[in-house]
């Protein structure tokens, strides 16, 4: 079997040039995705259709030859499986029934895995469809980020509703995060059992938290997920991405036990290099460079490679690729990383 380069890095080794994949690499910037999406019905229908979900997962692999495929799904399938009436509307994003204390008391996780069984079928299909050398990544949302949507009922600019709820109802918040951690760990184990080589935990809203809350809401629940997964699957490889965490990332790595940490584009490369001394890092090109292209893109790629290319690095963006990105810029990115990534 060919070597899966992402897995080599997750084992703490340096690969030259570094492997590359992109968060949200299957998405609206690709014309083939938009075509498939049209035939799926709703966005959640696409997530729960193994044939179409595996097709859109494979599209960027076919087009760009990336080193990893990431399961096409959404972090909000967990609240959907908890019967929170999740929906997605064009231009408005996700919505669901906002949860309160009594709703948290009534949450029933008994049929979550059955509800998510199409996702596991998608993972199984992908493992048989992907080239041998391509790493298959599963994922889930971190409890804090998922909770922000559950509490507000939709996305908000600074997650004020969830932050306020945490201050006013700390016991209920703790209960919600604990349940989400438990369900998420089961979900990741099932993805690994279905064929995922490694998994990523996305904490997209970690950056709105103060230091104390970051410890309680970002670090502890993710550490709980990782410990639970490892108790059952000791060799599991896990990437944890806490967007906006800044200098708290050092604590985050040490306390969660993640094999690699994802870095957003605001993390200074000098600090990223320090973090890399403790283990693999993933990131951290600004997604806007995939829209801008040109010299700005080339300089951005080279800066990341120059700073981080001599250690264990999975090259990625600092957050998801945007719908405005030019697919040609992804081609240029992959070519540049593979030609320059071995130099220096």
Curated annotation (Swiss-Prot):
InterPro entries: UROD/MetE-like_sf, Uroporphyrinogen_deCO2ase_HemE, Uroporphyrinogen_deCOase
Pfam families associated with the record: URO-D
Site (Transition state stabilizer): 74
GO annotation, biological process: protoporphyrinogen IX biosynthetic process from glutamate
Keyword Lyase attributed: yes
CDD domains per UniProt: URO-D (cd00717)
Catalytic activity: uroporphyrinogen III + 4 H(+) = coproporphyrinogen III + 4 CO2
Pathway annotation: Porphyrin-containing compound metabolism; protoporphyrin-IX biosynthesis; coproporphyrinogen-III from 5-aminolevulinate: step 4/4
Described function: Catalyzes the decarboxylation of four acetate groups of uroporphyrinogen-III to yield coproporphyrinogen-III.
HAMAP family, per the entry: URO_D
The protein, known as: Uroporphyrinogen decarboxylase
């Amino acid at each position: 079997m060919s070597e899966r380069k992402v897995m080599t890095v997750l084992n703490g080794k340096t690969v030259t040039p570094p492997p590359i994949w992109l968060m949200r690499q299957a998405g609206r910037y690709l014309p083939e995705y938009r075509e498939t999406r049209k035939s799926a019905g709703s966005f959640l229908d696409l997530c729960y259709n193994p044939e179409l979900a595996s097709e859109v997962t494979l599209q960027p692999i076919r087009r760009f030859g990336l080193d990893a495929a990431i399961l096409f799904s959404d972090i909000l399938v967990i609240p959907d499986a908890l019967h929170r009436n999740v929906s997605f509307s064009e231009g408005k994003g996700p919505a669901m029934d906002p949860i309160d204390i009594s709703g948290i008391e009534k949450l029933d996780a008994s049929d979550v895995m059955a509800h998510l069984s199409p996702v596991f079928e998608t993972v199984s299909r992908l493992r048989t469809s992907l080239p041998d050398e391509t790493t298959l990544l599963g994922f889930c949302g971190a409890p804090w980020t998922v909770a922000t949507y559950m509490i507000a009922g939709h996305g908000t600019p600074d997650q004020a509703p969830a932050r306020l709820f945490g201050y006013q109802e700390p016991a209920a918040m703790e209960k919600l995060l604990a349940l989400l951690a438990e369900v998420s760990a089961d979900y990741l184990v099932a993805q690994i059992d279905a064929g995922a080589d490694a998994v990523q935990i996305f904490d997209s809203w970690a950056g709105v938290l103060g230091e104390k809350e970051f410890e309680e809401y970002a670090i502890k629940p993710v550490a709980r997920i990782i410990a639970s997964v490892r108790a059952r699957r000791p060799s599991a490889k896990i990437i944890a991405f806490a967007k906006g965490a800044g200098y708290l990332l050092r604590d985050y790595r040490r306390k969660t036990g993640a094999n690699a940490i994802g870095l957003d584009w605001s993390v200074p490369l000098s600090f990223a290099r320090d973090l890399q001394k403790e283990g693999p890092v993933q990131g951290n090109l600004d997604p806007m460079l995939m829209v801008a292209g040109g010299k700005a893109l080339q300089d951005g790629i080279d800066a990341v490679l120059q700073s981080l290319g001599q250690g264990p690095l999975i090259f990625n963006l600092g957050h998801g690729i945007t719908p405005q990105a030019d697919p040609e810029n992804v081609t240029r990115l992959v070519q540049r990383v593979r030609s320059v990534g071995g130099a220096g």
